[in-house]
Amino acid sequence: MIREHRSREKLESYYEKFTEEGILDPNVHPWVAESWQQSRALGVPREKMSTEKRFSPEEFHRLQAKHEDAIAYLMKLSEGIREFFQEYNLSLLLIDADCVVLKSYSLPFYQMTPGEIEGARVGVEEVGTSSISVAYEHQTPFWMFGPEMWVKECQLGDACTAPVKINGECQYLITLVSMEQIELPQDAVISLLLTMKTALEAHLTESVRIKAEEAILDATPFAVYHVLPGGEVAYTNQLGKERLTRIGAKQEHETGRRLNLNDVILNYEHTPIYKGFRGVPSYNKEVTWITTAKTYEDITTVVPLERDEEQAVKSVVVVSMPIEDLRTLVAHAAGYTAKYSLQSMVGS
């Protein structure tokens, strides 16, 4: 949220009045006032930020691995604007839903190196009032002026924090701290923060959806392939990987070279996949796949996907089930039908 510019001298006087005399000025933002009272009740030190409550190196390594997707995405997102961070003396933090700092991406956070701040908990119980604690409490972006911070060493710069929500639940917090050595408009910092928040939310939402779809495809009794021109396999489910591995297909992780059907299917140019790249779909076709290891007979469906500007097919989806697996599935279905038919239940 964008807040009206406030006099730092007045904010400092409100802070001193409360911390020294226990009197809350009515001009203090109600959320800040509420957090000040909580910080005082908790006995949070005011002079220096405490990072004593932190994970051990081993525990923190496991925590970062758990959140690797979000950490890596924000790293990639911030790489292109790192010079901007340096020019305007901005610090960027990614924090989990328990207020533990997962990653410090730019300049030292209040003179703390990444090693000092990463793995530390920065909730209201540890550091008192901050944009982090207020945004976490109210689940909305919040801008906090330096003199409103509970810890005095953090009062040199302003900060803004926004919650990152997936399916309505707060998963992370992103914080930008501006040390104001060069004047930067508040709305510029907030716009940058909200852009990063929205991008991270979109990425993580898509990632959750993809993982769910992959789990569904891995549980199905047929092989699924997403094939690019030339036979390169962009994606395959677990059964597809197992089948390709059995017939000798290799993926070179060092070079990034993917599995390629041309390497293992001797009659590739005579299969529905090859025809699919010419725009011809196939549905439930009985297909013979000739490999150096074995000859397979499958029921195969091939669907051409998106086309480029010249209407050339850019990729196809292949769904394939071995005929012997299909026979087994049909036999099981027939057995269940007989077992649970109405006649067998009534005993006639």
Residue spans of the language-model regions?
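Intrinsically disordered, low-complexity polar/acidic regions
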Residues: 39-75, 82-85, 96, 102-140, ...
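Short, charged amphipathic alpha-helical "coupling" segments at sensory-output junctions
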Residues: 65-76, 188, 192-219
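Sensory modules in modular signal-transduction proteins
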Residues: 74-93, 206-241
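PAS-family sensory domains
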Residues: 102-131, 223-280
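PAS-family sensory/regulatory modules and their coupling/dimerization elements
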Residues: 147-152, 156-166, 264-325
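Hydrophobic helical signal-relay modules used by sensory signaling proteins
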Residues: 153, 212-217, 329-332, 336
